[in-house]
Amino acid sequence: MPNLTHTPLPRRLLLALMLCAATSLPALAREGVDVGGNSAFSKLVPAESVERSATQQYAQLLQQAAAQNALGPKDNAQVRRLRAIAQRIIPFTGVWNPRARDWQWEVNLIGSRQVNAFCMPGGKIAFYTGILNQLKLSDDEVAMVMGHEVAHALREHARKRMGKSAVTQGAARLGGAVVASVLGIDPRLTDAAARGGANLLTLEFSREDESEADLVGMELAARAGYDPRAGVSLWQKMGAANKNAPPQWLSTHPSGKSRIKEIEANLPKVLPLYERARRG
């Protein structure tokens, strides 16, 4: 007969199991998509520096647009539409990035044939008339685009790219010491990245970043009461627009059936959020 006498777990093992259980509970309890934590590379660059640069570059862009009579006035129907959609999405951003609660959000429309939109760090959103007019986007589809771009800012993808750049530059200079600098956050790398003056308007994101932005954006839209299934029709329209020449917005974004497939695979995670938002 086997000995069923209870044998106490070693204290260190018990503590490890308790820690694992504690850290896994929030993930199990959370509704919506699962994209993991933010990249450690973003910690190499101060968030304040990135947001300050974004504010300056955004202001310059608006000044240039205004000088060309291409900045949509606040009473423009499309401007009102974009700002109304943003007002529904913004309340759900703080969960993804606590700093977003203090961002000075801005939403503007720029007259241009470019099929493009973006959200810079700090909540600086801009749409080009081309993406609205050429693709004839519904409100749900606009919310998917906006959610995607806002997700880039919330997940600090620009900050991550700048951090990676700092590591690359530091590696050439410091050789093997770069590993220690990543773990210890060498201030020289931080300073180099902060002084780099990255053009946040033209910064390209990785395929992983784009996939993450798709999913987080879809959840933001769903929580705001916009149908996340619009992500499928959006990318179908993008694909059709891509037949002749790739729109600027697509040139740095992965496309194709795999993207739609990933959105469809995650719909069960966000459709309940959408239905709940609709019921109010």
Regions found by a protein language model. Give the residues of each.
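A Zn2+-metalloprotease active-site environment signal
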Residues: P2-G280
